[in-house]
Amino acid sequence: MTVDYTQFCPVARTLDIVGDRWTILILRDLIIEGPRKFQDLQRAFPRMSPNTLSTRLKTLEEHGIVERRTYADHPPRADYVLTDKGRELRPVLRTLRVWGEKHTKPPSPQRA
């Protein structure tokens, strides 16, 4: 689902890019784990459909946040890595983590 805020607000414009469900978690995974193959990301988010993962990665690529690197191996392989622009989001995710630690509760053991 693409949302178009068409506003002058930079927060709204940023949400156009990273505000879809799963996108921040994909970025978090790339920040923590470094370059990842599509299959690695699928395993990290088993409840996300492959189509959704593909769409989110393409959006991040289109905006220069993630780069898809391909290798001439047999079989061919590719991985996804943050660009400089993507790495600039590290402090944003760090701030979200700190806020979450302060203001949210972890799930109870039976819900985890």
Model-derived regions: residue spans:
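Short, contiguous, well-ordered secondary-structure segments
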Residues: 4, 14-17, 29, 64-67, ...
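N-terminal helix-turn-helix DNA-binding core of bacterial DNA-binding proteins
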Residues: 8-49
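Basic, amphipathic "hinge/linker" alpha-helix immediately C-terminal to the N-terminal HTH DNA-binding motif
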Residues: 19, 72-95
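Amphipathic alpha-helical dimerization/coiled-coil segments
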Residues: 90-112
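Canonical helix-turn-helix DNA-binding module
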Residues: 39-71, 75
